[in-house]
Amino acid sequence: MDTEKLTTMSRDAVTAAVRLALTKGNPTAEPVHLLHAMLMVPESSVAPLLKAVGADAARVDGAASAAIDKLPSSSGSSVAQPQLSGALARVLADAETRADKLGDQFVSTEHLLIALAEVDSDAKNILASNGVTTAALEKAFNDSRGDKRITSAESEGGESALDKYSIDLTQRAKDGKLDPVIGRDSEIRRVAQVLSRRTKNNPVLIGEAGVGKTAVVEGLAQRIVKGDVPDSLKGRRLVSLDLASMVAGAKYRGEFEERLKAVLNEIKSAEGQIITFIDELHTVVGAGASEGSMDASNMLKPLLARGELRLIGATTLDEYREHIEKDPALERRFQQVYVGEPSVEDTVAILRGLRERYEAHHKVRITDSALVAAAQLSHRYITGRQLPDKAIDLVDEAASRLRMEIDSSPEEIDTLRRQVDRLTMEQFAVEKEEDPGSKARLARINSDLADAKEQLRGLEARWAAEKEGLNKVGELKTRIDALRTEADKHTRDGDLAKASEILYGEIPELNKQLDEASAAEEDSQGKSMVSEEVTSDDIAEVVSAWTGVPVGKMLEGESEKLLDMENRIGKRLVGQQAAVKAVSDAVRRSRAGISDPNRPTGSFMFLGPTGVGKTELAKALADFLFDDETAMVRIDMSEYMEKHSVSRLVGAPPGYVGYEEGGQLTEAVRRRPYSVVLLDEIEKAHPDVFNILLQVLDDGRLTDGQGRTVDFRNVILIMTSNLGSQFMADPSMSPEERRNQVMAVVKDHFRPEFLNRLDEIVLFDELSREDLDKIVDISLDKLNRRLAERRISIDVSAAAREWLARTGYDPVYGARPLRRLIQTTVEDQLARAMLAGTISDDQKVSVDMNQAGDGVDVKGEAPVSA
């Protein structure tokens, strides 16, 4: 026979039979080899067909293996490639004849099985002994496949290539397996309009990842099922083509094209009854292409142009530009339908529509405030992703976290279990003692253990009852959802009596049970051990886990912290009350929602002499806002003095070295969008740097070298400068005169459009002698914290503190001389003493004035008491 007429599975079965004969050393491949090989293929339709006629496939396979073992065999290196026996050749010829009579274009494994039952051989005897006859097989085969015919090498047992390489979305909609689609009416209507055209009726959905392109197609499938579509689309099948399955396992050249051609022929022969959907449409360009073969897009073009294939595509803007637009012949066959990101209000509506599905899945209750919080917080805090996808993910993860907490033991039970374990171990240890004290202790332990076990049993019973109540609510919701799907099916089938029975009988009864169970849960919520409600707090915790922003910064506690901002930062930063107040006011305006949400949280320029706390305020601000001092991006602008170095901030342009690395500023903010950005010594930067910063200050965004938009809306931008510091140290000027002089210098150096975009220009005052006293205390506290790891404590006398403040005071250089003084006088002496062994761990150290009164002495005292 012509082996080209065998289906892929039949060809594989014959090849496996020959290989089996070679392995066993048989000179020829017999029908029993083929029978055994067909039963060894997991995807084969042979085993189900045998089952349909009442035979046991495993028993048939065992008999075939036993028959193969009885065949003549030879061993050694001289074993030749087995040939097909005469009986097997007759089986193949008989199968081909049967296929032709049945109108099949290819010979499947079912045809081979029927032929094995017909042609005289050991295989026929095995099948007959198991009650398998040709007539029974033919009847079962025809019943299973109906009017389907094998029209391609990929078809098997009447299974169409389309069913094999696609997912029927309309069937999934009938089965209630698709999530409800809320909104998107205009996009679905536009898709329906394009599909109703005579030619080029192929819409392509274009939009950012996560905006709901696939949901539009699922919405169309649901409308087709309900009949809520134009007449030209009523009763149509909407199938999603699975290109990955089509390419997977295509071993031979032309096999992929053969599979795709079979699918396309089926769609074409359906005469418009099938609408095809390809997600990630750009994958058809180049799919299956190899030397001398045609890719999928070129095979689709003729059908698309003639209107014989109604295809819906979905892809992102970038992929469309990169793949589809490069092929004008393919692009012109599609009509673009843009799918934009929904608003926060629309996202809340979408979440409300999905709530029931997620409640049933996680068996928890999701409050409306949680849905609103998910939409608002994801829009505000999660950048780089689109609504509604990111909001749905928030709700899903928050519900998942709560479900895990419900399934885990509550803290009270965990504590009691550990207590029972500890008392049990103590009981075993004390039981061996015979003295009266131990016996009294044992009695006390036994009493405590009995009480703990009794308490634990009560809590475990209560917890089990609460879990049962929660699970009951979830199960009721799942049953109601399944009944609604069943009612829809009966309505479509015209069985209105059954649909009415479900809608007006079974569902109301279940709803009543659900209300009772929910009411019981709500009554016990105040005293329950586990919560079953997803609230806005849970959503905020997930946002915190994703972005690193502390939860307390987004909920009620934020207002108290913001109102106390000056005092909290003042504990760390001495003096500069005006600077702290200016920064605090700007942050409060932003968090209260009064300032422009499309600009950075705050943008400040700190002016003043060195060592007065400009950088320290930036660190304190990062610690206050983000509970982490390291949440600060520090860039030394003296590194950006040359024109060519400016591009390092946003990344090298395409074609230049370092293009893939991104920019120092943009990458830092992209990875950590909630941070304080400190641009130190801003006056040293090249003027072109300020052109870049204009976009950040005005729009809160910046495009990097790779074309990605980086969001600066949640960044506090701080620039420091020493410009005009000579006037700050002039005692002959009043504060107003000093400010005017400094601002004159600043205006000469920076352009007006740059200065005009800043929230505040803050002038730092010189540190006073009194300020130095406080800084001494702060510096010594830091030293004490560093030494705490070695359990060493330092006690500095008042005289020594006063001397350090007096000697370290320098109005020109600020607080830095004091830091150096503490380093050279206290830390150096301490280090020498520790190395010499005169001061060791767990020891108290005293610091006092020396006898000459021109320095301090560091001495070890008694060990620190435990």
UniProtKB/Swiss-Prot annotation:
Residues 342-548 are annotated as: Linker. The keyword Magnesium does not apply. The Clp repeat (R) domain probably functions as a substrate-discriminating domain, recruiting aggregated proteins to the ClpB hexamer and/or stabilizing bound proteins. The NBD2 domain is responsible for oligomerization, whereas the NBD1 domain stabilizes the hexamer probably in an ATP-dependent manner. The movement of the coiled-coil domain is essential for ClpB ability to rescue proteins from an aggregated state, probably by pulling apart large aggregated proteins, which are bound between the coiled-coils motifs of adjacent ClpB subunits in the functional hexamer. Induction: By heat shock, bile salts stress and other stress conditions. GO terms for biological process: cellular response to heat; protein refolding. Pfam families: AAA (PF00004), AAA_2 (PF07724), AAA_lid_9 (PF17871), Clp_N (PF02861), ClpB_D2-small (PF10431). The lineage of its organism: Bacteria, Bacillati, Actinomycetota, Actinomycetes, Propionibacteriales. Homohexamer. The oligomerization is ATP-dependent. This is Chaperone protein ClpB. It comes from Propionibacterium freudenreichii subsp. shermanii (strain ATCC 9614 / DSM 4902 / CIP 103027 / NCIMB 8099 / CIRM-BIA1). Part of a stress-induced multi-chaperone system, it is involved in the recovery of the cell from heat-induced damage, in cooperation with DnaK, DnaJ and GrpE. Acts before DnaK, in the processing of protein aggregates. Protein binding stimulates the ATPase activity; ATP hydrolysis unfolds the denatured protein aggregates, which probably helps expose new hydrophobic binding sites on the surface of ClpB-bound aggregates, contributing to the solubilization and refolding of denatured protein aggregates by DnaK. PANTHER family: ATP-DEPENDENT CLP PROTEASE, HEAT SHOCK PROTEIN 104. Residues 3-147 form the Clp R domain. GO terms for cellular component: cytoplasm. Residues 84-147 are annotated as: Repeat 2.
